[in-house]
């Protein structure tokens, strides 16, 4: 019983701590500057990161 409760807490905590990102569309990049225009078109905000040669767009405020 205790192990199930701990596992449930771990799952809930993990989902709460995941970053708020959008991006079903795969955008190839080499630098974060490559992500600004595609992210602006996708989310309306130029905030994005280039991670593993793929843009990860973040929402504004």
From Swiss-Prot:
Q: Which residues form a coiled coil?
A: none
GO cellular component terms, semicolon-separated: extracellular region
| Cited InterPro entries | Scorpion_toxin-like_sf, Scorpion_toxinS_K_inh
Record keywords = Amidation, Disulfide bond, Ion channel impairing toxin, Neurotoxin, Potassium channel impairing toxin, Secreted, Signal, Toxin
Pfam families linked? Toxin_2 (PF00451)
**Tissue note:** Expressed by the venom gland.
Q: Which residues form the signal peptide?
A: 1-23
Any single GO molecular-function term of the entry would be: potassium channel regulator activity
Superkingdom to which the source organism belongs: Eukaryota
Disulphide connectivity of cysteines: 29-50, 35-55, 39-57, 45-60
Subcellular localization(s) per the UniProt record: Secreted
- Cysteine amide modification sites are 60
What the record says about family reads: Belongs to the short scorpion toxin superfamily. Potassium channel inhibitor family. Alpha-KTx 06 subfamily.
Q: What is known of its domains?
A: Has the structural arrangement of an alpha-helix connected to antiparallel beta-sheets by disulfide bonds (CS-alpha/beta).
Per the entry, what this protein does is:
Blocker of voltage-gated potassium channels.
Official protein name in the record = Potassium channel toxin alpha-KTx 6.7
């Amino acid at each position: 019983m205790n192990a199930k409760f701990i596992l449930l807490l771990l799952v809930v905590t993990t989902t709460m701590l995941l970053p708020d990102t959008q991006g079903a569309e795969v955008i190839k990049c080499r630098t974060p500057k490559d992500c600004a225009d595609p992210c602006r078109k996708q989310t309306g905000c130029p905030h994005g990161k280039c991670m593993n040669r793929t843009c990860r767009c973040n929402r504004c405020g």
